[in-house]
Amino acid sequence: MAFITDPIADMLTRIRNATIRKHKNVSFQHSKTKVKILEIIQKAGYIKDFQVEGDLKKNITVELKYKGNLSSISGLKRISKPSLRVYTSASKIPFVQSGFGIAILSTSKGLLTDSQARKENVGGEIIAYIW
């Protein structure tokens, strides 16, 4: 297996590619951060469900959500990367697709959506946009 320099970008790319190909499920390696991001994406209604499988080498299987023939996810974009970190203050948290999408932020209070971060009045690192 190849060494992945940005596992979060790899996860988002796998989800994006699976939605383009109309796959029902997609799998990738487990990490706690990925699970937290998937919990946020699931609460926002972009995926049906996800499961952690395996004992020693854990994998995550995500069940994608479709409305008819269209995916619930129109787009995914990794913002802050290992080579270029992107931070924002609470007052400058961006609206994704004029409020129709979500931004996932890593804050001092954990991983939050853009709306949760505004309510908590905390800024942080912008992980990804999903719309």
Swiss-Prot record:
Matches recorded under InterPro entries: Ribosomal_uS8, Ribosomal_uS8_CS, Ribosomal_uS8_sf
BP term (GO), one: translation
Cystine pairings recorded for this chain: none
Keywords, in A-Z order: Ribonucleoprotein, Ribosomal protein, RNA-binding, rRNA-binding
Assigned GO CC terms: ribonucleoprotein complex; ribosome
Biological function: One of the primary rRNA binding proteins, it binds directly to 16S rRNA central domain where it helps coordinate assembly of the platform of the 30S subunit.
Family statement: Belongs to the universal ribosomal protein uS8 family.
Superkingdom field: Bacteria
Range of residues in the leader sequence: none
Organism annotation: Mesomycoplasma hyopneumoniae (strain 7448) (Mycoplasma hyopneumoniae)
Record-linked PROSITE patterns: RIBOSOMAL_S8
Record has rRNA-binding as a keyword: yes
Gene Ontology molecular-function annotations: rRNA binding; structural constituent of ribosome
Protein's name according to its UniProt entry: Small ribosomal subunit protein uS8
Subunit structure: Part of the 30S ribosomal subunit. Contacts proteins S5 and S12.
SUPFAM superfamilies recorded: Ribosomal protein S8 (SSF56047)
